Amino acid sequence: MLSDTICAIASGQINQAISIIRISGPNAFKIMEKIFLGKVGKSMEITFGWIHDDNQKIDQVLVLWFAGNKNFVGEDTVEINAHGGVLNTNLILELILKTKLARLANPGEFSLRAFLNGKIDLVKAQAINDLIHAEVKVQHQAALNQFLGKSSNFIKNLIEKIEEIIGIIEVNIDYPEYDDVEILTSDVLLPRINQLLADFDQLIKIANNSRLIYQGIKTCLVGAPNSGKSSLLNILINENKAIISEIPGTTRDVVEGNFVLDGLLFKLFDTAGIRKTTEKIEQIGIEKSYESIKKADLILHIIDASEKNRQNLDLKAKTRPDQIYLKIYNKSDLLENQEEFKDEILISAKYQKIENLLEKIKSIFAFLGKNKEFVANSFQISQIELGKLAILDAKTSLESGFGPEIAIVDLRIAWKELKTIFGRVDDENLLDSIFSKFCLGK
């Protein structure tokens, strides 16, 4: 894989002031000798000249030269800084491919090579991708902490604890005659296994909060027709996206939008009003409303506070313990007396008076902003959970009467699952899956 040379546009296919074309591999400098009218630079040098095709000038460029491992990729690399027109940039890329000394890179292949060349571990590689795709400040900070290795320390501590137990078991098996060896029976080992499980549970609990940071907080707006769901969505996303009408059943499909609060990304779903109806299309919309409730992290149940005979929708009964459910009383502007709602969240979507709702949401999710030291993406969470399962198997073996020499098999599996987070990956398909999510040219 690393014996060939790859190239790609690293700056995106848009008109811009400057574009970057990256070439990496053993033929990188040889390609430039063919297409560059200018001085072939030394490593870490920038040179100025023309890109040409058989002496036909194409663009005047700056070229950055990186020899060997003195760059991100860890192999001979050239970066061409060209004028950023889409056509101009693609003409240069086509010229590079025309030499037949390079092929077009796959998405994430430069980062994959950096990983395989030992320049970055798998955590840093994924952190780079997360930095690129960060939409809000909290996501950016989480990805940066991953890149700086702050999150890695939590996992490395678990790995060290497992290694210590494996080491003691191996000494017990191989050198039982040594006086200084701690005798590790099942009774002695079980408390250590239980402590490991507690450590895993704590890590998984914290890590699961990372999903809310990376994927956004899925927020479902539900309620009876004309309760003000669409009005609230439009206010939150600052856009007239949902249709507002006095006619019940106007919203037939789920309307989506995003908004940022306190640095956190919220993904909103405005659903069809829930009521009893014989209208087939409206029934389909209501079914979709219930589906959205199942997927949500935060459920905002919007209720028309001005209605004397309010429809009693027991939506809380349809929620799970891990979901957050809030009752929101709308249309405060129509109330003569608000005393009835003094302990409730009361808003007026019509007049954009929703400050108390925003403050309530901020207080609920404040813990996410404080959890800046440890975050994990979906791949890392999966590996931690697999590690925990292996530790559970070790515990089961010990409780079933088997000795440490059997439990060590599962401990080694747990160790491998955690080490995979940093790059001890034997499965090439897994690597391809991880890096294929990266941008072309990265």
Curated annotation (Swiss-Prot):
Annotated GTP binding lies at 226-231, 245-251, 270-273
This protein's GO cellular component annotations are: cytosol
Q: Which InterPro entries match?
A: G_TrmE, GTP-bd, GTP-bd_TrmE_N, GTPase_MnmE, MnmE_dom2, MnmE_helical, P-loop_NTPase, Small_GTP-bd
> What are the binding positions for K(+) in this chain?
N226, S245, I247, T250
The entry's Mg(2+)-binding residues are S230, T251
User: What domain of life?
Assistant: Bacteria
The Gene Ontology biological process annotation of the record reads:
tRNA methylation; tRNA wobble uridine modification
Supply the alphabetized keyword list: Cytoplasm, GTP-binding, Hydrolase, Magnesium, Metal-binding, Nucleotide-binding, Potassium, tRNA processing
As recorded in UniProt, its EC number(s) are 3.6.-.-
The question of whether Cell division is a record keyword is answered with: no
Q: Does the keyword GTP-binding apply?
A: yes
The protein's location, in the record's own words, is: Cytoplasm
**Cofactor dependency:** K(+)
Q: Where is the TrmE-type G domain?
A: 216-366
This entry's comment on the bound cofactor is: Binds 1 potassium ion per subunit.
Binding-site residues, (6S)-5-formyl-5,6,7,8-tetrahydrofolate: R22, E79, K119, K442
- Describe the protein's quaternary organization and the partners it interacts with: Homodimer. Heterotetramer of two MnmE and two MnmG subunits.
What NCBIfam families does the record tag this protein with? mnmE_trmE_thdF, small_GTP
Annotated PANTHER family: TRNA MODIFICATION GTPASE GTPBP3 (PTHR42714), TRNA MODIFICATION GTPASE GTPBP3, MITOCHONDRIAL (PTHR42714:SF2)
> What role is this protein assigned?
Exhibits a very high intrinsic GTPase hydrolysis rate. Involved in the addition of a carboxymethylaminomethyl (cmnm) group at the wobble position (U34) of certain tRNAs, forming tRNA-cmnm(5)s(2)U34.
Similarity comment: family membership: Belongs to the TRAFAC class TrmE-Era-EngA-EngB-Septin-like GTPase superfamily. TrmE GTPase family.
What protein am I looking at?
tRNA modification GTPase MnmE
Q: Can you name the source organism?
A: Mesomycoplasma hyopneumoniae (strain 232)
